[in-house]
Structures are given as C-alpha cells and as structure tokens.
C-alpha cells in the first residue's frame, strides 16, 4: 500500500484514533485494504446512527450493494443463514440472505427504506419475523477475532464500531469512480479530502489491536 498517500492522515495509530473520533461524531470513514487483496476502499457508517442522507451518499457514490456487517451471534439471533453453503468467492466474503424490514418500508430500495431495514435488524429486540427475505440490504458475517483473523472490510468495520463504542454492526459499500470502475487509493484519498472524511487501513487497525493486546499482556 502507498503509505505516503495515507501519511497525510497521520501515523497508523493516529489514523485509527481519527477514524474512531469521526465515527463517534456519527460521520463516515473510508476503510482501505491492501493493494494485493481487493485494493478497494469502503465507505462505512455506524449501523446505529446512519441517516437517509448518508445512505443516499453511499448509493450515489458507491457500488450500490449496501452491506450490513454483523457478528455471528447477531446473525444467529436473526436466523440468517449464509447465502450459499459452499463459498467459492476469492476473498470468502460471507454474504447471508438479503433482508428487508417487514414494517415501515415501501419497496425497500430507497435510502430511507434501507436505513429502516438496518435500524430494524440491529435493534436488540429484533426477531427473525421482523425481517423479510430477500431484500435490498445485504448482511455480511464478520469472523470472530476481527482483522486479526481475516484482513477483510467486514471484520474491519465491526472492529471499528466496537472501538468507537457502538454495537458491533456497521454499514459498508465499495467506493467507485464516476465511470463505474473501482476507486483505488489515489481516488479514495481525493474523495476523502473532498468530503472531509478520514481514511484508515485494515493494517492500521491490526496494528492498533496488536499494540493494545501487547500492553494488556
């Protein structure tokens, strides 16, 4: 990864602290992975606080496949199975069945409807019956252990939400360029500066978590 581009947002630990601060303000963060992996940046928001305006930004600026990152325990509570029994995707992205709130939505595809679905799903008292299947929100299962187990955007999103004091649930969507191609780090940095967003890498998160574990040992 081109560290020189990320350096304008501080050191790895400073980038993590800045991302946590922005999330606590209810703002979005761009989470990037290694250029030898997906080499993509995901716009992420806390599931608890995402607004219709923020969702509209995700739909407008990103790929359109809005995902809700959840823990295994939460997915068991919602009785959401994996989309396929044999996951053959290159990066083992763990999609479940897609969902829609049963109440409070129309077609389910608008920004407001997707926020309603997300708020419904992450509520502590949400029951499986509160969600229709399929729908326009795509849950993802985060592996236990977070980015120290899998260097994925899903795990990074859940880890960041925990670090910011939220429920371990976040919303993500992959940033794209105007021509529909995937945004790479230079474009991600430009987008972040234009919209006053912070950028943090999955490797930054792993470093912060490993450092915390060493201090706690």
Swiss-Prot record:
Pathway named in the protein's UniProt entry: Cofactor biosynthesis; riboflavin biosynthesis; 2-hydroxy-3-oxobutyl phosphate from D-ribulose 5-phosphate: step 1/1
GO molecular function term, any single one: manganese ion binding
Catalytic reaction annotation: D-ribulose 5-phosphate = (2S)-2-hydroxy-3-oxobutyl phosphate + formate + H(+)
Binding residues for D-ribulose 5-phosphate: 37-38, 42, 150-154, 174
Any one biological process term the GO annotation gives: riboflavin biosynthetic process
Function text: Catalyzes the conversion of D-ribulose 5-phosphate to formate and 3,4-dihydroxy-2-butanone 4-phosphate.
Family indicated by similarity: Belongs to the DHBP synthase family.
Protein name: 3,4-dihydroxy-2-butanone 4-phosphate synthase
Lineage: Bacteria, Pseudomonadati, Thermodesulfobacteriota, Desulfuromonadia, Desulfuromonadales
């Amino acid at each position: 990864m081109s560290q020189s581009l990320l350096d304008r947002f501080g050191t790895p630990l400073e980038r993590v602290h800045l991302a946590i601060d922005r999330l606590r303000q209810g703002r979005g963060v761009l989470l990037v992975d290694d250029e030898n992996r997906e080499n993509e940046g995901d716009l992420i928001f806390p599931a608890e606080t995402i607004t219709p305006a923020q969702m509209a930004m995700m739909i407008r600026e990103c790929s359109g496949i809005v995902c809700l990152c959840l823990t295994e325990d939460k997915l068991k509570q919602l009785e959401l199975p994996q989309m396929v029994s044999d996951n053959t995707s290159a990066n083992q992205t763990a999609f479940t069945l897609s969902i829609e709130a049963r109440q409070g939505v129309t077609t389910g595809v608008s920004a407001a409807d997707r926020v309603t679905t997300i708020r419904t799903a992450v509520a502590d008292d949400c029951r499986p019956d509160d969600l229709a299947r399929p729908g326009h929100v795509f849950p993802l299962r985060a592996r236990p252990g977070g980015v120290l187990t899998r260097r994925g955007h899903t795990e990074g999103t859940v880890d960041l939400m925990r670090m910011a004091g939220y429920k371990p649930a976040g919303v993500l969507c992959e940033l794209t360029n105007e021509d529909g191609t995937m945004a790479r780090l230079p474009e991600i940095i430009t987008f972040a500066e234009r919209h006053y967003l912070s950028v943090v890498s999955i490797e930054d998160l792993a470093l912060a978590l490993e450092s915390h574990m060493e201090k706690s040992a």
